[in-house]
Amino acid sequence: MALLLSVTNYMKALLYIFILSSSLPLMAQTPLLPFASSREVSKKVSTPDSQDVRYIPLFGSKKMVEEQLLNATEFLTQCDKSFKDRSDASNFFADRGWEYLNDGLLDTATYRFNLCYLLNHENVEAFWGLGSISYQKGNYEESTKLLRQGLILSPENTTLMIDVATVQLACYKEKRNCDDIDDALRLLEKSLQIDPSNANGWLKFSIAEFQLEHYDRAWDYLHKCRQIDVSFIDTTYLQELISKKEDPLGLFK
């Protein structure tokens, strides 16, 4: 058994070398609304866009995916030897993608999520990860599209619903061409109907109502967040809300 594990780890190490790619120079990242995902998206750095198809979400097009499959015979063979099946291999590369994303290596993370997708077109993590990267890069329209593709695969995923709504709120704030903010409200409402104990969901619901200048509702939802987990309250947002209307309960000054 120990020998089998050793061989498996060795094969995975070889696989790592096979798909290893160099990192590009780093640049500063603008602070964003945090996602609901338990995986922390990096606030440190990001990498510039690359024209290499490996660093374009889903390799850029269906045609490019088909070309990648034709050219990836050795990679797929190594995966078949190293993992119990391709779904397992896909999950492996998804995990690596989240690790690189947390380290701020966005292009490297993109390639890992692309490999995740190449191995399993129905792995929600591929769309979730690539959508998170697009959000980090400020490509909100692309992020919304990718996250929604993930939501099609996992329609009752409340955390993913909140992440889609988070992108839409950021998009709405910058007056970009995204889905209507009413859709963000609908997603938040649905997620909280399924899981009313989600403090981050109530926080995002509060922010949505704040952007619509519904300050009473914003306070109501913020206090629901506070009652569940006060640590989720964003102090910057709290001060913005106070500047528009004082706390009706008098708890925050």
Residue spans of the language-model regions?
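Bacterial Sec-dependent N-terminal signal peptides
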Residues: M1-L33
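N-terminal leader/linker segments that initiate helical-solenoid repeat arrays
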Residues: Q29-N102
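Terminal, low-structured helical/coil segments at or just beyond the last alpha-helical repeat
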Residues: L32-F35, F75, D88, A199-K253
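Alpha-helical adaptor scaffolds
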Residues: E99, V124-N200
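Short coil/turn linking the two alpha-helices of tandem helical-hairpin repeats
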Residues: G104, G138-N139, A165, A170-R176, ...
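Structural marker of alpha-solenoid helical repeat scaffolds
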Residues: L119, L153, I194, Q227-I228
